[in-house]
Amino acid sequence: LDLGYVAFYAVGAYVYALLASPHFGIHLPFWVILPIGAAIACLFGMLLGAPTLKLRGDYLAIVTLGFGEIIRIFLNNLNAPINVTNGAQGITLIDPIRIGDFSFAETSTLLGLQISGPQKYYFFLVALAIVVIIVNVRLQDSRIGRAWQAIREDEVAAKACGINTRNIKLLAFAMGASFGGI
């Protein structure tokens, strides 16, 4: 039970905010930042997963919950001596998501209906969630997914079958973190 997903979500959000705002003067497009944010969240997932591989149940939940809290406090206090996250005020003036000339922040008309910026973001995030669900279903039916299921059912038997449980569990942490970072 991993309760640290809020930390991976925060890492992905701050990567986007830092790379798509005037805070550092970098204005990269969303499609460039998305894999960068997922990769950095994946790195944080491996950093959390490596020391916690032997924990189970309540102990794993407590450690991952603590990790989420550590990341929150760290990001809130990362404004001195170098202002990276602007502290509790956060990063402002983040660029809206654009696909070509189509901006998700502006109201537009489609088939005579007015679609506001928040509605466009909603439909975009639903589409992104559907893509993530499809990827997860495909992963579940793959060799890696079967290894995850074998480890869940009986870790000793999975080891006896030749599954490298340490690497597969670390991959599970990393993949979950990357999806959280998206």
PLM feature spans:
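Transmembrane alpha-helices and adjacent helix-loop boundaries
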Residues: 1-182
